[in-house]
Amino acid sequence: MILTVTMNPSIDVSYPLKQLKLDTVNRIADVSKTAGGKGLNVSRVLSQLKAPLIVTGVVGGHLGDYLTTQLDNDRIPHNFSKIKGETRSCIAILHEGSQTEILESGPEVSEEEQAEFIENFEQLLRDTDFVTISGSLPKGIDNDFYSVLIEKANQTGVKVLLDTSGETLKTSIQSSFKPYLIKPNETEIADLLGKDVNSEKELINALDDDIFHGIEWIVVTLGADGALVKKGKDYYRVQIPIINVVNPVGSGDSTIAGLAYALSENKTSEEVMKTGMVTGMLNTQEEKTGFINPDHFDSLYEKVTVERL
């Protein structure tokens, strides 16, 4: 089973407008409200792939109840820890070809609530083979929190796919307990090392830095150029076809879902890379975030190439 972790989930509200008028009333007929957060995007794609999974994290208040109801409606199993604070909202106003976002920072999670989550997390690990940890941490939680989760998972033989950024990522990979897979982009690699990465050769050299030692999989996503992957001591260039992009938001989360799914199915390294790229591409072809059409999987899969460097 795959356990997905979302510590800072949200209700994503989308308001489509022909024109946003300031300092007056804007009436909206078509409102979309979905359970949001990077880990929930991962979860939806895993569900569409028919992978056995369970979702965890922290939720609170009326919006937390709404979020779990949405997951129930999608038949996605979950086991969240409850907190006193209210789950956040993230509002996107779509207007004149642009998108204006209003993002709440989210609730503060107390030390007691963190301890309760960790206890629940340890229970869930008993039936888990892989864990995906995605996104930011809410207020009140230190940057080393994911390191604690990785340690708990590693101690039970469970492998962790980590998709976060900034100081949280840096702290997590500098710990003595390593994630099994990370999925940074070139900018995040440069930020981690404090230097520019401007070519494939520089990127390969960067991935040989001591900070990455002990991480089995490093999947550096390159947008339309595919990915550069380090698996163990080997490097691979993964190239993808040109496709029509409808909505790129959530593609990274969909890639994580594909990688986790393929790993859980004991696929070969090449199959893992290709599956991750395909699920990421499939997401870009849908209007909704964290959605794929599995019927189109095979046709794209055949067009992805993997070259060992």
Where are these regions (language model features)?
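Conserved phosphate/ATP/ADP-binding segment of small-molecule kinases
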Residues: 147-233
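Conserved phosphate-binding/catalytic region of the ribokinase-like
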Residues: 201-309
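Glycine-rich phosphate/adenosyl-contacting loop at the front of the ribokinase-like
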Residues: 1-56, 63-66
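Gly/Ala-rich phosphate-binding loop of Rossmann-like dinucleotide-binding domains
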Residues: 47, 150, 154, 264
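Short acidic, glycine-rich surface-loop motifs adjacent to enzyme active sites
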Residues: 127-138
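Charged helix-capping and loop-helix junction motifs
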Residues: 115-118, 143-150, 198-204, 238-243
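Conserved N-terminal subdomain of the carbohydrate kinase-like
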Residues: 24, 48-128, 298-309
